[in-house]
Amino acid sequence: MGTLHSLIAYPLFRLTICLATGIFLFDTWWPENLSWQYGAAIWLLLVGVCGGLFWLSHWRWRWLFGGVAGVTFFLWGGISVLHQRETVQYSWAGEPVIYKGIVESVPEVRGKTLRAEVRVEMQRLSGRKWKRVDRNILLSWMPDSLSSPLACGDSVCFYAKVSRPFSEKELTGFDYGDYLLRKGISGTALAYAGNWRCTGKPHSLSFMQRAKVCQQKVVDVYQSWGLEEDVQAVVSALTIGEKSELTPELKAVYSAAGASHVLALSGLHVGIFSCILLWLFYPLTYLKHGRKVLALLVVCLLWGFAFISGLSSSVVRAVVMYSLYTLASFCSEERFSGMHSLVLAAFLMLIYNPFFLFDISFQLSFAAVFSILAFYPLFSRSLCIKNRVLRYIWNTLSLSMSAQLGTLPFILYYFGSFPTYFLLANLVVVILAGVILVLTFAALCLASVPIVGNTVITLLEWGTLILNKSMQGVQQLAGSQITSVYLSSSQACLLAGVIICLYLCWASGIHRKASDWIRLLVVCNLFVAVSCVEYAGEAPEQLYFFRSEVYTRKKDCVSTHRSETGLLCIRNMHIAVLNDARWRTYEASSRFPLEYAYICRGFKGSLSQLDKLFAIRQVILDSSLNDAFREKLIRECQLLKISYTDLSVQGSYSVVL
């Protein structure tokens, strides 16, 4: 109970809650046509009032000062997220134009294309005029043998259509365009071969670019070791956060086993690495002020580790939290400095970038650490074990249960699945992750040493293979994963409330009151009641046309419909998916009734030919069609008086069945 009371009494915790609430509410509800400057004017007024109250320093006005300060940070959060959104959003031309930019990340292979983040600096207007843009996009390009390959830091000139990706939220619950916007990316584009050129090599790289290049060089070293593909992919992900080589099958194995967190560089890896460093440099503690020197040395080395891993947001967040915790230990011996440093880290990161609040890894990371700080002492003290090995096992299980308990509402809300054997998997993961980290850094140092280097690399490969096989074994156990348990936002909030009430009840110990049990039971009953109402409600089944596929969705269940001929019958509704030239040679004595003709990339022919075979009620033009062919089909629809829907304008089309 003391942990929570100490946290609530911490002024920065209250201000952080106000800041986060402002970010969330303004991002969700602020009208798009209303400028953030109106809120800024009110904020300046509140800052003046807050300063005046602080200067007067009357004890009886302390609540007023606290309230005004809370509203001030609430508005600051809202204004900052609106300003951040404005700096990312851009009205791109609705057609291909020429752009100039700089490659900001290391290009990665995506099927037949390469993709990288590009900082678009200029857009060409009519004539020889150029317009300043200064926005980041995800640029994909087809390899061109006539142009030198692009690398991080290169200047590039390309001809392409830049646009914001269409939202998939109605179908999948995920808005890719909004996701990119919160990552600071304004749009996406595809440049075909011959439509891009490398116009210059960099004289100097930015600090972030140097980190990305450093990360790629480490990946190149891993590739030179001749490891198996899955082994190299896991080593790259586990040690430096490079996940592009992870296959969907490998990700599914770790997800089902409840160990996917080991593939995302985060606090677990920083914690393991810091333990290794503390053990290596422990002799420094025998010197005068040795403990402080050791702590500062570990912090510096952790920031070096963050640089090598490409300064990814997850590892930077973990290192910031560790650094603040170390600083707090210098300034205070208070028991709750860990919780305070966690709040300070969240506050500083939201001030720096308010979009962090919507990052799933940010939410999971802070929820896990908060839950560990709260629940781990309760779990670990619940059993008194004297045997060292058994105590280590119990402490590891306590850590896993604490983290899983805090992240449970987020996992069920975002992913709708729960790994049943996560405790078994994490017993293996924690040990082998540490072994792989040690062997990897040893291999980097000793790879050039004859015999010794090859031996370490072989041990690394064996250790990673054991990890992969162990996770496959856990995945193959009966009932290894509970799926399709999606929670609504209200259910997730109530489940979080249940967990908080459970903590309050457990932490009270012998001082537990009847009110603690009543509070827990009330929230549990609310959660059950809301769940019953939401699951009992009938949701209509809907038909979707999106990305050259036909889907049906009922609640959280999405099904894809395909056939060899392209003809579908869904609820007595006839649909044709047209993506080839097969219908050009067909003839018919009578026209077949067709509710929807879904024309996609690859279709050869014309609507006049289709009109002889089918009585089409509505044509749907997929966004994959090129502009000239789409315009031709639209003219034919108008001529034949057939209604049509252009998905290049709205992204997807849905019908209630």
Roles of regions detected by a PLM:
Residues 14, 22, 59, 189, ...:
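Hydrophobic alpha-helical transmembrane segments in multi-pass membrane proteins
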Residues 145-148, 154-161, 179, 388, ...:
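Non-globular, low-confidence helical/coil segments that flank catalytic cores
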